[in-house]
Amino acid sequence: MRKIFVKTNNVRNFIGLVENLQNKPKNIPKMGLVYGEPGLGKSQTALWLACKYDGIYIRASNLMTSRWLVEEIVREMDELPRYLTSDNFNVVISKLIQKPRIIFVDEIDYLMNNYKSIETLRDIHDKTDCPIIFVGMGLALRKLERYKHLYDRFSEIVKFETFEIEDLSQIFSQLSEIPFTPDSIEYIHKKYNRFRQIVQLISKLETIAKENGLTEITFEIIKELV
């Protein structure tokens, strides 16, 4: 299987969100939300974009406090966390003013019930004018709407949708070293619509094809295997 980052429609929408936030005037809020069901490639895309744009990628976790969150941001800036949370916060603000960077906060659902952490991210945004992008699950938008004063700052929102047949064809053509016929991809599309599932399926079918000397995967073969 080829190691290629496939730019599906979801990925292109995520890229568009990032570029739109970067290009907004100073007086326009630069917070964004990317949300959707699990397994659609949100985290992989956020990590890829953080590398592409020299951003800061933070993965929130259960029980994460605002202190812990700020310390993680400080570490991602290649700084040693200070003892006082206020000192760490000032380091983050100072560094971002010197060198503006996008902050990606993945698994944001873990922080949605932690008002202080959400407020901390808002304060970082307001003091630095740096884009901050929340990445969350299917209910993230609804949870975010509870914070009315914060929700107004989200000028860009993208929902990751399940794959269309065109997305699936693109994924198979770019990742698989064994060709798949169009009707075989249509059959797979009816059964699989999560990126993780599809990658695992490609790996499995490539192995079977190589072991059996198959030069392509057809509809008849897929029906027997999937």
Residue ranges and their predicted role:
Residues 2-16, 39-48, 149, 166-226:
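C-terminal alpha-helical "lid" subdomain
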Residues 25-47:
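Walker A/P-loop nucleotide-binding motif
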Residues 32, 50-63:
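Conserved catalytic segments around the Walker B and adjacent sensor/switch elements
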Residues 32-38, 124-148:
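Sensor-1/coupling segment of RecA-like P-loop NTPase cores
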Residues 55, 145-162:
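A short helix-turn-beta junction within AAA+ P-loop NTPase domains corresponding to the substrate/partner-engaging
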Residues 60-62, 138, 155-168:
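Conserved AAA+ ATPase "SRH/arginine-finger" region at the nucleotide-binding site
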Residues 93-117, 131, 136:
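Conserved P-loop NTPase "ATPase switch" module shared by AAA+ and STAND
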